[in-house]
Amino acid sequence: MPSPLALRPYLRSEFSPSVDARPCSSPSELPAKLLLGATLPRAPRLPRRLAWCSIDWEQVCLLQRLGAGGFGSVYKATYRGVPVAIKQVNKCTKNRLASRRSFWAELNVARLRHDNIVRVVAASTRTPAGSNSLGTIIMEFGGNVTLHQVIYGAAGHPEGDAGEPHCRTGGQLSLGKCLKYSLDVVNGLLFLHSQSIVHLDLKPANILISEQDVCKISDFGCSEKLEDLLCFQTPSYPLGGTYTHRAPELLKGEGVTPKADIYSFAITLWQMTTKQAPYSGERQHILYAVVAYDLRPSLSAAVFEDSLPGQRLGDVIQRCWRPSAAQRPSARLLLVDLTSLKAELG
């Protein structure tokens, strides 16, 4: 019996968002504020589409490292005196093409402004001398805490096989708080999808919570612009993402649609309400079962049975992780359902 999982295809060869392939911004060495004795070389021009976001390196001041992921490190810093987060994308020695793709994918949200999306402030492909960085992205500082940390209380824990911290029970998240955070995330998805952008790696670890208790979607390194996908005769399937949150149609190598984010949201909402990890077991076994046998996390927890709002929330989750992408609700319909449910809860 052939496997329902798709063979991993090669990435397309060009990821620059512009036909102008020149490097973005400058300098190749950091200025005196970051590296004593360095000089500022002449700044090459950005690709025309991104010229507005060239980095003024003299205004950058790194403060502390916040963490590291599969494609780079994130630092807290100030830029022009304002708190920001700075992401340095590594030159992945095993798959540099994937690193390049991650860098340019992060800029899919350049110029976009929304309360529930982490904003890109500036970007550059110029890096400090001797560094292993492919490029630098300066982003709005969305907060010190991720939704993953709020759910599991996992701040400071080592990373697990799925690229997230090992889980332990966190503080209580009320049903009302789950719905509040869910509305933030769905509002962000609705905006992204209206711009023909799909995130493709939505999960609690990629959702920041600001000091104002607002959820902001971050980490667009796996994102795609739907219009770009249509430009290639052979489909482009992102290599990144987190397998526990990945829609079954993507695991099978089918086309990318916004409904893949809706599936990921369903797993995320399930995590918020149960405070549990979605699956346990061998990665390949889970992938096969999700595709071949419609494996999903259990909805037998008391939170989905003890109250009418809990039952309705379980129904919402079930609709969002249906095997057929066409049968899942859009972000707009989901927003209506969750708003109604939150009003019912009071």
From Swiss-Prot:
Name all Protein kinase domain ranges: 60-341
Q: What is the effect of changing residue 292 to V?
A: In OZEMA20; likely pathogenic; loss of function in oocyte maturation activation; decreased activation of the ERK1/ERK2 cascade; no effect on localization to cytoplasm
Catalytic center residues: 201 (proton acceptor)
Name the predominant localization.
cytoplasm
* A biological process from GO: establishment of meiotic spindle orientation
Question: Could you confirm whether the keyword Transferase appears in this record?
Answer: yes
- Report the outcome of residue 199 to L: In OZEMA20; likely pathogenic; loss of function in oocyte maturation activation; loss of activation of the ERK1/ERK2 cascade; no effect on localization to cytoplasm
Q: What is the enzyme's main class?
A: transferase
Question: In the UniProt record, does the keyword Ribonucleoprotein occur?
Answer: no
Cellular component terms per the entry's GO annotation: cytoplasm
Against InterPro entries, the record matches this protein to:
Kinase-like_dom_sf (IPR011009), Prot_kinase_dom (IPR000719), Protein_kinase_ATP_BS (IPR017441), Ser/Thr_kinase_AS (IPR008271), Ser/Thr_Kinases-Pseudokinases (IPR051681)
Name the consequence of residue 139 to T: In OZEMA20; uncertain significance; results in decreased activation of the ERK1/ERK2 cascade
Q: What is its EC number?
A: 2.7.11.1
UniProt cross-references to Gene3D superfamilies, sorted A to Z: Phosphorylase Kinase, domain 1, Transferase(Phosphotransferase) domain 1
Distribution of this protein across tissues and organs: Highly expressed in oocytes. Lower expression is detected in early embryo.
Catalysed transformations (reactions): L-seryl-[protein] + ATP = O-phospho-L-seryl-[protein] + ADP + H(+); L-threonyl-[protein] + ATP = O-phospho-L-threonyl-[protein] + ADP + H(+)
Taxonomically, the superkingdom here is: Eukaryota
Q: Indicate the impact reported for residue 319 to H.
A: In OZEMA20; likely pathogenic; results in decreased activation of the ERK1/ERK2 cascade
Q: What one GO molecular function would you report for this record?
A: protein kinase activity
Regarding protein family, the annotation reads: Belongs to the protein kinase superfamily. Ser/Thr protein kinase family.
Quaternary structure and interacting proteins, as annotated:
Interacts with MAP2K1/MEK1.
Q: Which PANTHER family match?
A: SERINE/THREONINE-PROTEIN KINASE TNNI3K-RELATED, V-MOS MOLONEY MURINE SARCOMA VIRAL ONCO HOMOLOG
Tell me the function of this protein: Serine/threonine kinase involved in the regulation of MAPK signaling. Is an activator of the ERK1/2 signaling cascade playing an essential role in the stimulation of oocyte maturation.
The protein's name is: Proto-oncogene serine/threonine-protein kinase mos
Report which gene this protein is encoded by: MOS
